[in-house]
């Protein structure tokens, strides 16, 4: 299921480049769909696991019991694990930053990447919108995941992610000719 792994990374700022090895560890890439299918297939083997495909309207907790209200009915349990942004989060002092991503897998015309070294955090970007960095995870000499990450109070327009990625690829990676393979917007 692991499609690639790295044991060495760079951390970059405008005045620092630090390369470090993970020693006994490695950073592994797993495609989301592969993980999803593995867990789904594994879970279906258990009699006490039921999958429901319904639109969730609300999630609440009352007296240590979790309630999930859907368009079809209401479900209860001790725990509810929610990995989706079902509702617009309220920005307040306890929840003041949103983590946002947009990542492109790019393919270059000529070898442009060292597959042994990833850039885990490249802070050589403007920081006016919040804590902003890129990471670059090369999987071949001609392909890499380039991902823009931002912690801020407001969600950017999709065009702003596009411009940031294009500028980074051109200005920082020094790549002029590339194609975007699959494209993903995550929030």
Predicted segments with their positions:
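N-terminal FAD cofactor-binding segment of flavoenzymes
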Residues: 1-15
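Short, mixed charged/polar active-site loops
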Residues: 17-19, 74
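Short acidic-glycine loop/turn motifs at beta-strand connectors
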Residues: 12-16, 139-142
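Alpha-helical metal-binding/catalytic segments enriched in His/Glu/Asp
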Residues: 39
